[in-house]
Structure formats: structure tokens, C-alpha cells
Amino acid sequence: MLPTREEALKLIRDGLLFNPGPWGKHCLTAAHCAEKIASACGDMDVEKAYILGLLHDIGRKFGVRHLGHVYDGYVYMKSLGYDEVAKICLTHSFNNHTIDEYIGKFDVTDEELTIIKTEVAKTIYDEYDRLIQLCDCLAGAEGVLDIENRMNDIKKRYGFYPQDKWNSNMNLKQYFEGEMNKDIYLICEKDTFATGNL
């Protein structure tokens, strides 16, 4: 089950009341990219793509956490009965089915970590998981970013960027460009899209 677009926007607005920050605009940009790419692919549910892109970071509602936001989003969406969104909250950070490539602090309890590991290991990724992984990498708070520039920025901030994750993001870009037969930055309106307000 999925929330409607308006329900999803309300969830983000409510989340920003608890934890204001640029994550809300990042989510809007990810949703924009997901909608545009899904539409250009032709065989994806555009509304579903938008909603999943919008809510992938909803765990940020519960405060400033790194790996913790994955757990928080997963549990929160499960509690509302939005299992497809819960899955995306979990999978968007793990391109290669492993938490070893997570960039950021492991600020979770042992129990939370076990749940994340167990759920990631048994999850079968689909086109929407892959799409949101790509869109997470494309989305800045102010607009659409160049993927390599974004990964380099993360590498500078954290001191590393796992090569497997880097390669996976570039492969996702190539894959979806092949599906669309178009340049990803043109489809996502990189040079013209400006993230609005929620």
C-alpha cells in the first residue's frame, strides 16, 4: 500500500516540523527525478516513483541520524502500513545488498543494526529500489546534481567513498539512460529545475 501524493507531502511537512533541514528539499528533488525518469522509461508507475522518491528519507523526521534514519524510516512506514515505502527507506542506502558500503556513522543500537542487516539481506531489489538509489544520488536540496560531483562532495566530507558503490551509481545512470534512450540530466532538467518549497 502507498500513500497518495498529497498524503506523502503531508508526511514530509510534518517531518520537517520535528526536524527542520535541507532533507525536505532533497526529497522533493529526488521525487522530481524519479517521476521524470519513470515517465521516460514508459513502463513504470510514475505516481509510485514520485511517492517513493519523496519518502525515501522520511526517517530524518526523528532527528539527525546517519544509519539511524534508515531504521527510523523503515519502522515508521511499516507502522503506517506503507510496506513499499518502508522497503525504499531501507534499500536506498545499500546499492549492493551490504551495509559495509554505508557512508556515515553507524549510530544505531545492536538490535537496530541486526534488523537492518536481516531485512537488507532478504530483500529482492526491483526497478523502484534501483530508481530511488539513483535519484538519491542525483538530488540536492537546491536542484539536480551531477552524480560524479555529488559523490566527490561526499568523499570530501567523509574521507572515503566505496568504489563498489561509486561503480553501482554510475551503472544505474547508464542503465536508466539505456531504458530511456536519453541523457539523464536532460530528463531530470538539471540545468532548469529548482526545488520549490513544501
Each predicted region: which residue ranges?
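Divalent metal-dependent phosphate-bond-processing catalytic cores, especially two-metal-ion Mg2+/Mn2+ enzymes
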Residues: 3, 16-43, 55, 80, ...
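His-Asp-centered metal-binding catalytic motifs of divalent-metal-dependent phosphohydrolases/nucleases
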Residues: 30, 46-82, 86-97
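A short small-residue
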Residues: 8-16
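Acidic-glycine-rich active-site phosphate/pyrophosphate-binding loop
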Residues: 2-8, 48
